């Protein structure tokens, strides 16, 4: 059937707007290897402090070779167009196939659509992509672009002739994928005759329209699943019977996928997937595909799953919690080297454990990105329990260790990420411990003996510890990367041959957990983060720091994917690691006063952090951090209320409008444009001035289900969980999203100049939300002639937020430039709070 004979999805397409409906072919992928060679460079703590939009400057040899061969040259399509699926925009202007590739991989894809022109005429099309692309109109090639600068968008205008009636538009786009790849194109209809987009579909046009509306509006019936049945709600009945395939995946490093298939009848209004108790824990992506005949439509949703009922309350003693943590990981985590570590720590060798290790060895043998995450727990386990492994597996492990690439100065052709602090620690730890295991063998890439490799690794570990002890982490407060740092440090604390290194590593572990405790609200880290992802922001109970809090302080839950938990447990059980007892009380603040915690992180103290908490609320921000700059994965403000981990709010400027995407920044993780941020106690201000070309709104994560009471009215939003209360005030209307995945979860503030004022309090002082609103609804900020923002607060009086981040309030002066790496925690009286009476 030709395109002219089929039904069509027809959409108005205005001038100066993107063309967003397409048919796609299969994604072509081909491994791209170049000759092994060393690479210049060193650890770069500030790699994410981007200078040109979101461009990361480090270039691998494979990219250099690729550009030498293909930059400026016409891309070469690998096949003819054959439609296998239909792309629906869901508010994204791009056709976005971004993802994560662990080895250098050439990728390419065809896309096709039709522009139905009212009259013939000349038109201008603007093509944007990060890789290469060719544009065809009615079968005639109009030109190409091929900058191939990794993850940096380029644009090119094309003048084309449109005929009256349908005009076929084809785009072939390709690139070299290295780790996180921004693989997309955007085609804008800049100028020309009046047109509409017209995409052929093999079912009735009205049914195709209805299926798009259902995919656009579908959502989970809960914000998080803690044992309940998982249900996806449709906004309208299905117009036709269809097949539904769902792939449930974890984060981009997860090795597991769970597939479900359903047959849905016409008229269905929901999809019941079964109990979440039988599904894998963690934040999970549900990749949903509807198929009706040859029509294939899909989108991705995401939600947290946790199993608190099975896990129960944490044991009372540390010894029992250590045993519980090891047993939980051994029985319920992903089958990787971390799970194998926990099993070996419990004396569980044998076929199942060896199968886990064997399945992960290709990652190390082929130097996949993040192979260092896999290798370090394996080296720790091999050091302690190699006698539980078969001779054949030990030989294979030895071969993998000897052939691995431990640093960029060794020859290789991989795209392992050597630059961040957490990866650098793991590479150096692996070289140090791996060399010790095989002292007389030759490490192939460096040509060193194991003894020599150990010496080099030791020098680099010492240098890394020097840097950490002076500056700590540029990736401050990062929920995903604290466990990675702990993965390396626990291996050193247990296995380092040198006692000084063991002691320094142990002290560093304690320091990291002090930071977590100071920044935690009832055990859950709450505050600004240097690097964050949607899959580590949205969940609370199932992130690994929750499990670590359960291990150390008896409050938290387990997820499925872990990095450091069993290593930390073994360090406590077998290697004398101890934590100050007072950290438990700090992590779960219960007193009548408040804790104010100011500290700096990163080389030259570039990240100045402010945190304030009471037993009812916690709020953390970063002070005077690159206001107005393009952001990366920085979360600048984060708060929690009451005792429920899901009762959290953060505010950001989305880096992209596609939800559940791979952008850095993404829809929820990080900021496209960083705001000016100020905080004093439980009062904060965010001022956004958004760059052109970026999404024209800011938004707040505001999950109604997680709160006990809410009000959203005009420019005000109030929420209560337990005794904690939050008020958000916008400089425009705060619009609740009522359609799609973020229904009753997202508040949007339209405009490029968005101001949010955040004020927290508690039920004891305000009585209810009406009382909170009566006291604080008129809060506003005015700018004085020197650029300071001034707020008159009912409790704190005149609060002055100066442009350099200095705060003046209540006779105090807080200067972020003075905040030390070690930090200062002070206890402050809470205005209007009455001390709790002891039970009589």
Where are these regions (language model features)?
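Active-site cradle of extracellular carbohydrate-active enzymes
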Residues: 418-466, 471
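Ser/Thr/Asn(+Pro)-rich, low-complexity disordered segments
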Residues: 208-422, 456-460, 555-840
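Accessory carbohydrate-binding/adhesion or oligomerization-edge regions at the termini
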Residues: 1-90, 172-211
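Aromatic-lined ligand-binding clefts that engage carbohydrates, nucleic acids, or primary amines
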Residues: 117, 121-136, 169
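Extended amphipathic alpha-helical segments with heptad-repeat/coiled-coil character used for oligomerization
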Residues: 490, 499, 503-566
């Amino acid at each position: 059937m030709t395109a002219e004979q089929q039904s069509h999805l027809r959409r108005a397409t205005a001038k100066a707007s993107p063309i967003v409906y397409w048919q796609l072919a299969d994604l072509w992928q081909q491994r791209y290897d170049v000759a092994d060679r060393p690479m210049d460079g060193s650890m770069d703590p500030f790699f994410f402090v981007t200078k040109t939009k979101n461009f990361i400057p480090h270039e691998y040899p494979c990219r250099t070779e690729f550009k030498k061969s293909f930059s400026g040259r016409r891309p070469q399509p690998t096949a003819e167009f054959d439609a296998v699926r239909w792309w629906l925009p869901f508010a994204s202007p791009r056709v976005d196939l971004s993802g994560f590739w662990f080895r250098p991989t050439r990728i390419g894809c065809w896309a096709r659509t039709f522009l139905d022109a009212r009259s013939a005429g000349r038109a201008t099309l603007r093509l944007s992509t990060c890789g290469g692309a060719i544009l065809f109109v009615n079968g005639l090639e109009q030109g190409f672009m091929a900058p191939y600068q990794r993850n940096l968008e380029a644009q090119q205008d094309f003048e084309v002739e449109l005929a009256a009636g349908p005009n076929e538009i084809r785009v072939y786009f390709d690139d070299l994928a290295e780790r996180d790849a921004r693989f997309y194109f955007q085609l804008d209809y800049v100028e020309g005759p009046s047109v509409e987009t017209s995409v052929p579909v093999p079912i009735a046009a009205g049914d195709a329209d209805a299926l798009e509306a259902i995919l656009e509006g579908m959502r989970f019936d809960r914000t998080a699943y803690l044992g309940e049945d998982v249900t996806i709600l449709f906004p309208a009945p299905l117009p036709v019977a269809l097949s539904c395939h769902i792939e449930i995946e974890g984060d981009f490093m997860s090795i597991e996928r769970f597939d479900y298939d359903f047959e849905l009848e016409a008229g269905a209004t929901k999809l019941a997937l079964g109990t979440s108790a039988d599904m894998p824990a963690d934040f999970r992506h549900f990749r949903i595909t509807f198929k009706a005949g040859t029509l294939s439509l899909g989108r991705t949703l995401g939600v947290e799953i946790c199993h608190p009922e099975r896990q129960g309350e944490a044991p009372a003693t540390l010894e029992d919690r250590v045993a519980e943590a090891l047993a939980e990981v051994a029985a319920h985590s992903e089958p990787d080297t971390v799970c194998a570590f926990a099993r070996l720590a419990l004396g569980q060798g044998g076929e199942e454990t060896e199968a886990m290790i064997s399945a992960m060895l290709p990652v190390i043998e082929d130097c996949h990105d993040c192979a260092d995450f896999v290798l370090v727990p394996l080296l720790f386990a091999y050091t302690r329990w190699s006698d539980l492994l078969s001779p054949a597996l030990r030989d294979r492990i030895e071969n993998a260790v000897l052939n691995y690439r431990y640093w960029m100065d060794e020859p290789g052709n991989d795209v392992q990420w050597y630059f961040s602090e957490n990866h650098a620690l793991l590479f150096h730890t692996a070289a140090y411990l791996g060399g010790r295991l095989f002292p007389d063998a030759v490490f192939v890439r460096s040509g060193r003996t194991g003894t020599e490799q150990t010496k080099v690794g030791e020098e680099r570990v010492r240098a890394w510890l020097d840097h950490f002890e002076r500056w700590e982490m540029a990736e401050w407060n990062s929920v995903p990367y604290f466990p990675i740092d702990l993965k390396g440090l626990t291996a050193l604390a247990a296995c380092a041959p040198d006692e000084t290194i063991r002691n320094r590593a142990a002290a560093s572990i304690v320091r990291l957990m002090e930071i977590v405790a100071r920044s935690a609200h009832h055990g859950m880290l709450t505050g600004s983060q240097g690097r964050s992802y949607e899959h580590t922001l949205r969940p609370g109970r199932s992130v690994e720091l929750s499990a670590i809090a359960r291990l150390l302080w008896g409050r938290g839950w387990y997820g499925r994917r872990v990095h450091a938990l069993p290593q930390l447990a073994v360090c406590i059980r077998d290697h004398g690691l101890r934590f100050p007892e007072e950290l438990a009380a700090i992590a779960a603040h219960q007193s009548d006063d408040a804790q104010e915690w100011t500290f700096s992180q990163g080389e030259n103290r570039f990240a100045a952090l402010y945190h304030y908490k009471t037993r009812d609320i916690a709020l953390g921000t970063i002070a005077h951090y690159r206001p107005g700059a393009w952001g990366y994965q920085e979360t600048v403000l984060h708060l929690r209320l009451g005792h429920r981990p899901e009762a959290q709010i953060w505010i950001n400027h989305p880096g992209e409008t596609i939800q559940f995407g791979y952008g850095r920044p993404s829809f929820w993780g990080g900021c496209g444009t960083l705001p000016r941020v100020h905080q004093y106690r439980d009062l904060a201000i965010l001022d956004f001035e958004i760059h052109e070309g970026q999404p024209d709104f800011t938004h707040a994560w505001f999950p109604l289900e997680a709160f006990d009471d809410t009000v959203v009215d005009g420019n005000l939003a109030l929420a209560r969980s337990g005794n904690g209360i939050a008020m958000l005030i916008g400089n425009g209307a705060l619009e609740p999203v009522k359609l799609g995945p973020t229904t009753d979860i997202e508040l949007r503030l339209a405009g490029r100049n968005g101001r949010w004022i955040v004020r927290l309090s508690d039920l004891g002082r305000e009585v209810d939300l009406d009382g909170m609103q009566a006291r604080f609804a008129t809060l506003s900020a005015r700018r004085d002639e020197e650029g300071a923002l001034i707020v008159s607060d009912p409790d704190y009086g005149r609060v002055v937020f100066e442009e350099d981040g200095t705060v003046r309030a209540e006779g105090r002066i807080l200067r972020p430039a003075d905040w030390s790496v070690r930090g200062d925690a002070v206890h402050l009286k809470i205005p209007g709070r009455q001390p709790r009476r002891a039970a009589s």
